[in-house]
Amino acid sequence: MLSDAPLSLAPDLDAIADGHLIRYMSTSGTTGTPTEVTGVVFSPKGQPPQQGWPIVSVGHGTTGLDDECAVSRAPDLRGYIWLVRNLTKRGWVVAITDYEGLGVPGPHPYLEPRSEGFNVVDAARAAMSLIPGSSTTWAAIGASQGGQATWAAAELAGDYAPELDFVGAANLSPAADLTEMATHVGDGRYDWSQLSMMPTLLTGLSVTVPELRPENFLHGSFQDNPHDKALLLGCHNGLDPARAAAIGRLRANDFHGITPQDAEIFARALKRISLPLGPASGPMLVYAGGADRLIDARWIHAAVRRACALGDTVQEIVAPGKGHVDPEGERLGVQWIADRFAGIPPPSNC
């Protein structure tokens, strides 16, 4: 822990929890060097139970690539304030990392699983050192980019933070395997939800794969309209009508390479961030929406099969008709964590 400052967001939350804006040390997944990361920690008010408050480290979904897109810089934590309320009411300490490069100077290595995983683990460490009533028991929950982050954290936790008692991760609509997206370069078959993410995806991946040149792939209104480009690469502000309009001007055939090597470089970049990286240190819930148009449930299932082959304990749930980051998945994820904290044996359908 490098620093913390009081954080007050809403009267109803202030009544049940104490908030902290934190800066803490973590590790780069690409270089192995120390990094500074920001985030938030909330602890329940009152006396902790005898065994201490368990900790939940949250991996947030895609918010953007710039410092101002950090969860900790938004008064509603970019929508995560509701989750903080829910979890602290259960008597849990909550930590939300901003991830490396968000909230602090420097590029954000978007979807780099090792960096995100280290950030999630170290947020739990920071919470434990900051909150006197916390226990060493912790779990993780995340969705989309955050689901990838918490899955990676589950794999890293045992060796990276052996002093903590990791009980599992709930990975919701995780960006665990996007390699199929490379097969659509130039063929015009991207779904609208995938189109909306392509500027962020290509630009973010280029941080750790410099040979991937976003300008070789991004054409049409992205290239021709500076205002659209700024909106598409800006913070993801929910249902922002201006950004939605810019997305509406994208066309599937706007995304294609200009050199023979471009598609292969993109494919390698996506393969590099695919999970699993190795066996997990604890059980996992993996939830996917059967109608998810951004991250196909079949892609997630392929990653689960590989994790099962490594000996992981995984409960996979595919919800028919549900889309990306469905509220039902979040409800199931929170209950799954409650069961792990209660010592109930984790289910598996590997």
Regions found by a protein language model. Name each.
Residues 1-48:
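Catalytic-loop region of hydrolases
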Residues 9, 175-276:
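Accessory cap/linker subdomain of secreted extracellular hydrolases
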Residues 29-89:
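Short, surface-exposed "cap/lid" segments of acyl-processing enzymes
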Residues 57-59, 99, 319:
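Alpha/beta-hydrolase
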Residues 110-131:
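Alpha/beta-hydrolase active-site loop
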Residues 125-196:
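Primarily recognizes the serine-hydrolase "nucleophile elbow" in alpha/beta-hydrolase
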Residues 258-268, 294, 301-350:
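C-terminal catalytic histidine-bearing segment of alpha/beta-hydrolase fold enzymes
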Residues 280, 285-292:
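Short beta-strand/loop motif that positions the catalytic acidic residue
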